[in-house]
Regions:
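Conserved catalytic neighborhood of penicillin-recognizing serine enzymes
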Residues: 112-137, 191, 254-269, 364-419, ...
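A penicillin-recognizing enzyme superfamily signal
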Residues: 279-300, 312-314, 323, 330-342, ...
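Short, well-structured active-site flanking segments
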Residues: 93-102, 176-179, 239-242, 335-336, ...
Length: 791
């Protein structure tokens, strides 16, 4: 056998040597034949298609040439495969690309009819013809198709050729390909088609005009039923299936494509136009979140609030589970705008990041008292949402109640530049101006961000705690990674390290504990009394002018972000994070499986003694409690508010050794806040006791315990008029710790009034600069310089 093969090869070599020109021509022809099929047979643009992680269609965008042409599927459904082969090319699996018998029969019939009545082309030839669209149907073109068809058969399997045909065959109008046709005419995926539906689509490429609703129904029905009969006669379908199939009605009207995640489709089309993207979207969850969005849209539009967005993230993988980029509004209300990526004013949504950064840096402890008093800093006057003051609030309560004044004072202590650098590490893209541009308003909505970046930030923080507690106090170098919506993408979280990325696990955990204390939305106030209630860390935000309502929440497995407002930026009086965004947040969380709370990251915490009243590290004269704090918290300030005072035996008066014998002096530790803080604090805390007055004869030793509440130093005050054009008075206020004692008021060193108990004085001064002096009975005084301006 080997000798015969060797002899045969030798004869070929000898022939080539004798016939060099013929050999060269033959080689050239073979080369042309080999390269006659381009690597990419079809160059048509495709629709952008997105699918859920389960493979369900979420939406599609028309191709650039105006055709609905889906990218080819991995396989052709069995029913359609049988239908198309038995209808178009019964010998498909036997021929080399063309069928001589079918061609001869077609030639005879066409010649007899005097026109083309039968093509005789195989499915392989039809694939070639579809790829060479626009070519005239001549016998010369037919020869080219035959040659190319044989080459196609050599390079591709029969199943691959069927896939090409199914993806590019015309199905009427601008519908191209089986998958699009199954959605357009039957509203289902191609693998869900019945035998009757598959038969309809098998006959359509042969005569696409038959599909127009209400027209040619008899012809289409006849073609379909003949094919079904053939399938029955060939044993492909049984008698019962055949009889049931011929009773199925023909499609009467086209179906709309699913639009389950239209804004995610926009996002995918920007990055991967003309491809099929299998996403990480959970199909059932997406549909239910869409229902929630529709429900609240129908409610909110009655108050002229037309837009909202919802994003659900899996913390462990950073995968997007649900993506609702906007409400189902109409074109007049910017329904096509993807709010998830749109920069909007942050409101209070950045407060947890400041709180966490200060904990992590050892600048405060969870219970550290923060001032909540009238505040003016270089002309900037922050106000709490409820326009009240608490005097002093524990830092964690200031966060959970979203108080603005404590947040501004915290930022002032931490510094705008330092906090800005922290935010840059989180890669909040829209915070892109200088720190000086934002100033202290950075913490109250002076900056912009978007739902995508904020949800990513909280997902990364949550994952930091999870990994740290489950891996013996280790972090990962790439923990702060991007969110992902593509199912085939696997994030790289880097290698283990003992160095934190941005915030330590302890600071994050304590921040989440504070966020978990937030009061639930209206109608759900009793949530904390039920064991089965959701335990999540969440934060709301409302921008200036009620233009943006935010709510972002997280547990150990999921992050949910919600934005509500108008894409135009129009504000509405009732639009707030708590009343508008938070209800959506909790409805979405109710769709998700319950999760356990974050494990405590003990390796990143230290137990210390703190003052029970001030929240600072405890001094010897403080009432003490133990508390877990970040390790740097061991170096924070000690309590500045506890003082040791001396009282007489009745403990009603302060004394000293100059006016009381040492044997009669009682020493006590007393919690003393600065005058303005104390003035507001005592109205919220009936247990707060101001310092006892000095016993008569000891007054000279006391220090001043009064301060201005209003005005602030060097204030510029504008006098306003009422509706009757009368100038409104300015109300001066002073906090004074001595109960039932008098204060004497002077304007420009001229006595004006005496006040007792409530130290307020209305004045209507002239324009210009004035000096206000307040003196108590012991001669202690405070002064303020103000400038009066009339509007």
């Amino acid at each position: 056998m080997k000798k015969k093969i060797k002899a045969f090869l030798q004869r070929i070599i000898n022939w080539i040597k004798k016939n060099k020109i013929k050999s060269a021509i033959a080689f050239l022809l073979l080369l042309i034949y080999y390269f006659s099929i381009p690597r990419t047979l079809f160059k048509e643009p495709y629709s952008t298609v997105i699918e859920s992680k389960e493979g369900e269609l979420l939406g599609a965008k028309i191709a650039r040439d105006g055709q609905w042409r889906f990218p080819a599927q991995d396989s052709v459904p069995y029913k359609f495969k049988k239908c198309i082969v038995y209808f178009e090319d019964e010998y498909f699996y036997k021929h080399p690309g063309f069928n001589p018998g079918a061609m001869i029969n077609a030639f005879k019939q066409n010649r007899k009819a005097g026109k083309v009545v039968r093509g005789g082309s195989t499915l392989t030839q039809q694939v070639i013809r579809l790829s060479r669209k626009g070519k005239n149907r001549t016998y010369f073109e037919k020869i080219i198709e035959i040659i190319l068809a044989t080459r196609l058969e050599l390079g591709y399997s029969k199943n691959e050729i069927l896939e090409m045909y199914a993806a590019h065959a015309p199905f009427g109008g601008n519908v191209v390909g089986l998958e699009m046709a199954s959605w357009r005419y039957f509203g289902v995926q191609s693998n869900q088609l019945s035998w009757a539906e598959s038969a309809v689509l098998a006959v359509l490429p042969n005569a696409p005009s038959l599909i127009y609703p209400g027209k040619n129904q008899i012809k289409l029905l006849s073609k379909r039923n003949r094919l079904l009969l053939k399938l029955h006669q060939e044993g492909i379908i049984d008698k019962q299936t055949y009889e049931l199939s011929i009773e199925e009605p023909l499609p009467q009207k086209p179906y709309d494509l699913p639009q389950i995640a239209p804004h995610l489709l926009q996002r995918a089309a920007k990055n991967e136009e003309g491809t099929r993207v299998k996403t990480t979207i959970d199909y059932a969850l997406q549909n239910r979140v869409n229902q929630i969005a529709r429900y609240y849209y129908n409610q909110y539009k009655q108050n002229e609030v037309h837009n909202l967005a919802i994003l659900v993230i899996d913390v462990q993988s950073r995968n997007v589970m649900s993506y609702v980029g906007n409400s189902p509004a109409d074109a007049d209300h910017q329904k096509d705008v993807d709010i998830i990526d749109a920069p909007r004013s942050t409101g209070s949504i950045l407060k947890p990041l400041l709180y966490g950064a200060m904990l992590d840096d050892g600048e405060l402890l969870p219970n550290t008292l923060i001032a909540d008093i009238p505040t003016q800093i270089s002309g900037y006057t922050p106000q709490n949402f409820n326009l009240t003051f608490d005097g002093a609030v524990p830092a964690h309560r200031a966060l959970s109640r979203s108080l603005n004044i404590p947040a501004v004072l915290m930022l002032q202590d931490f510094s705008v530049n330092k906090f800005y650098e922290e935010l840059q590490k989180f890669k909040l893209r829209n915070i892109n101006k200088t720190p000086d541009h934002y100033g202290l308003s950075l913490i109250l909505g002076g900056a912009e961000s978007n739902l995508w970046d904020l949800c990513r930030t909280y997902a990364n923080l949550s994952s930091t705690v999870n990994y740290y507690t489950k891996n013996k106090g280790q972090y990962r170098t790439n923990e702060f990674t991007e969110l992902n919506y593509k199912n085939d993408f696997k994030p790289d979280f880097g290698s283990e390290t003992n160095q934190k990325n941005i915030l330590g696990a302890g600071a994050i955990w304590l921040t989440y504990n504070a966020m978990e204390e937030v009061n639930r939305p209206e109608g759900d106030e009793a949530w904390k009394f039920y064991d089965s209630s959701l335990k999540i860390a969440w934060k709301t935000g409302t921008s200036f002018g009620n233009r943006d309502a935010w709510a972002i929440g997280t547990n150990s497995r999921y992050v949910v972000g919600v934005w509500v407002g108008n894409a135009t930026g129009e504000g509405r009086p009732t639009l707030t994070g708590v009343t508008s965004a938070a209800p959506i947040l909790f409805d979405v969380f109710n769709l998700l499986p319950r999760q356990r709370w974050f494990d405590t990251p003990y390796n990143d915490l230290a137990e210390v003694e703190v003052c029970r009243l001030s929240g600072y590290l405890a001094k010897d004269n403080c009432p003490k409690i133990k508390q877990w704090v970040p390790k740097k918290g061991k170096s924070t300030k000690v309590c500045p508010y506890h003082k040791t005072i001396h009282l007489d035996k009745t403990e009603q008066f302060q004394v000293n050794s100059s006016c009381e014998s040492i044997d009669n002096i009682v020493t006590k530790n007393w919690f003393v806040l600065p005058p303005v803080m104390a003035w507001y604090y005592k109205s919220q805390h009936i247990e707060y006791l101001p310092l006892p007055p000095f016993k008569e004869g000891c007054e000279g030793t006391q220090t001043t315990t009064m301060d201005f509440i209003y005005p602030k130093a060097n204030s510029k005050i504008y006098l306003t008029k009422d509706f009757n054009s009368n100038v409104q008075p300015v109300i001066l206020k002073v906090a004074y710790s001595e109960r039932d004692k008098e204060l004497f008021w002077y304007i420009d060193d001229v006595y004006k009034a005496t006040t007792k108990t409530f130290h307020e004085l209305p004045i209507t001064p002239t324009t210009g600069t004035h000096f206000i002096t307040v003196v108590d009975a012991s001669g202690n005084e405070i002064r303020r310089k103000i400038e009066i301006v009339r509007e």
